[in-house]
Amino acid sequence: MPQNKNLNPISLPMDLKFGHEPQTEFYNNLAHIKVELVDSPTRSQALNVAWQYVKATWADHHDDTNPNTTSLKELSANLEDVLNFRALPTPMECLGFTFKLSGLSFQEVTHIIRHRAGSFAAQCTGDRDLRDDPAVIPEAVQNSPEFEDRWIKLVEDSKLLYAEMCDSKDISMMDARMILPKCMTSFYLMRLNLKDLLGFIAQRQDMQIQPAADNLLAAYMAREVLNVLPEASSRINFGKPDMHYVKTFRVPDGKGGHTSRGTNLYWPEPKNDIFEYHPEDSIYQSRREDINGTNNPGGDTVFTKLWEDTLQEIEGIQKSYNQYMGRK
């Protein structure tokens, strides 16, 4: 069909920023991360579906699966059995959780969408002008003035080039965006069933292999799950050793020596320091949080403070639930 200039132009769903000078706010990459639970089953719904599924197997009559015939504690104990594979685990696949993950750098984005079990919706980069999007800086770089200045300049220069290419209208936003750095931020919606969500948390809490941002995402998501289903405290455990790291850090190479089958970035954290190793077995001769810039101020890092605060909240939920169940 031909163009018709008598038609009124549509209202585009995005803001056009042609000719605007780029603006950039910089944030600490960990302090900027937020996790919001935007949709989930209620505790009552989870207890109900777990009871119905588990009791169906040996029921003589369809009414025998009615959760109204038992106590709340029995319903909770049944859900614990489901969560820990002591009963039919299928109910976990019936319970969906949707999170909004914001303040993510594009490095975190690549890690998250690699988890194939989730369903995702993304903040667009193709036909949305990115010239005013924030950027993040790791604490170690913030503690290194000579590197932080260069970091900021590279971000600002790349965003200016992006804006100028877009403004030319001879280069589309689709092509111009390729110049932008990974430290630009975005948000994603992520939906997982409970079974895959618990697996995601268990995998991403590993401080030896996973980056600090992933560790915090796991802790924040765990906190949100426990606020809905305190029964999940029987499954979620941030104090256990990271056994993939432990088992792959130093293994026989079949030639009389040893090699690594995993990620040997740092020395083991205290909870993982349960095997013998040589100091040179890792890329860095230190633990992760000891590497904190050329002007390392010492003391607790941003990660440590956020991590410990969140785990304290999680422990409080676990303690209250165990008291409710009559446990010490």
Language-model region placement:
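Family-specific signature for flavin-dependent thymidylate synthase
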Residues: 1-328
